A protein has these predicted regions:
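Glycine-rich phosphate/diphosphate-binding loop of Rossmann-like nucleotide-binding domains
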Residues: 15-16, 28-33, 39, 151-219, ...
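Phosphate/nucleotide-donor binding subsite
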Residues: 51-99
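N-terminal phosphate-binding or glycine-rich loops at protein starts, especially the Walker A/P-loop
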Residues: 1-43
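Short, glycine-rich nucleotide/cofactor-binding loops
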Residues: 3-15, 148-158, 302-310
Length: 312
């Protein structure tokens, strides 16, 4: 297996990418191809990895790409004009069969555009979308779309539900995953026009599309185990996702401050530390890797823009 990695994408690139790949390569049976500015990658690899570089270098290959698509770049323009960027080179390699999967922590809009224009959409899908995995009371919750498409039509949300249902059925083994529509209430009449129209389409065609649609789901109910997939447009989904990440940080920080407030609280917390550690770990978005683009012909993974070595 060949894993293509955009070494220049993300807030902490290329250092976090280099560290992450070097740590992971020992535990996976794959060749990793780093795509980016060759001189920079060679220099940083030597400085960061030191002697460890000799151990992993045989399974890590560097492909030169002179340009970088930044977070500030206009997505479509960047994909069309920066032909020698790490992202575009990666997409072309994936399309041509020079790799099995492409991973990037770079510009989400550019990643969506490149995946759509270069790798290509699956027939019948208007817009690929990001399927992110979140912790839930029983197992995990898939959120789709979690940031790729900020402006959607009702048919897009129906297709998101269809793709997510097939994805969960084939990867997790849930035969009829429960699909919910993220909304401000459970009633059919609640929500904006996009959500209300999407609800009616999902209700009407769920049987034909083999979607187990259970209706509207409020954010506060999403993690209780009653839904397997939460459907939203990319704007709403991303706000929801970032809110969860922020709340997780708040909980971890508050617990830490409470426990270490004084010696008595530290001693009192000792029996609960394993459970608290597991809880804190479940709230850490770094434990859940990247989001998979569903709807394109080959696997494309979007890592968090602020990914560190652990997440990679």
């Amino acid at each position: 297996m060949k894993i293509l990695v955009d070494a220049m994408g993300g807030d902490n690139a290329p250092d976090a990418v280099i560290k992450g790949v070097a740590n992971a390569i020992e535990d996976i049976e794959a060749e990793v191809i780093l795509i980016g500015q060759e001189a920079v990658l060679n220099t940083r690899s030597k400085e960061i990895l030191g002697k460890k570089l000799d151990k992993v270098s045989s399974r890590i290959k560097i492909i030169n790409a002179k340009e970088v698509i930044t977070m500030e770049d206009i997505p479509t323009q960047a994909i069309k004009t920066k032909k020698d960027s790490s992202m575009v080179v990666g997409f072309n390699m994936l399309k041509n069969g020079d790799g099995d999967v492409f991973i990037s922590a770079g510009n989400s809009g550019a990643l969506l555009t490149g995946a759509t224009l270069i790798v290509g959409r699956i027939r019948g899908i208007d817009r690929p979308a990001l399927a992110g995995i979140l912790p839930a009371y029983h197992g995990n919750l898939v959120l789709m779309d979690c940031g790729a498409n900020t402006n959607c039509k009702p048919i897009n949300l129906v297709q998101f539900a269809q793709m997510a249902s097939i994805y969960i059925s084939n990867t997790v083994g849930i035969k009829e995953p429960k699909i919910g529509l993220l909304n401000i209430g459970t009633e059919e009449t609640k929500g904006n026009e996009l959500v209300k129209e999407s609800y009616q389409l999902l209700k009407k065609y769920s049987q034909d599309l083999k979607i187990n649609f259970i209706g509207n789901v409020e954010g506060r109910e999403a993690f209780l185990g009653d839904v397997d997939v939460l459907i939203a447009d990319g704007f709403t989904g991303n706000v929801f996702l970032k809110s969860i990440e922020g709340f997780g940080k708040f909980v971890k920080k508050s617990l830490k401050e409470s426990i270490y407030k004084n010696a008595f609280s530290v001693i009192g917390a000792i029996p609960s530390l394993p459970a608290l550690s597991r809880f804190a770990k479940s709230m850490d978005y770094k434990e859940y890797g990247g989001a998979l683009f569903l709807g394109v012909k080959k696997p494309v993974v979007k890592a968090h823009g602020s990914s560190d070595a652990k997440l990679f």
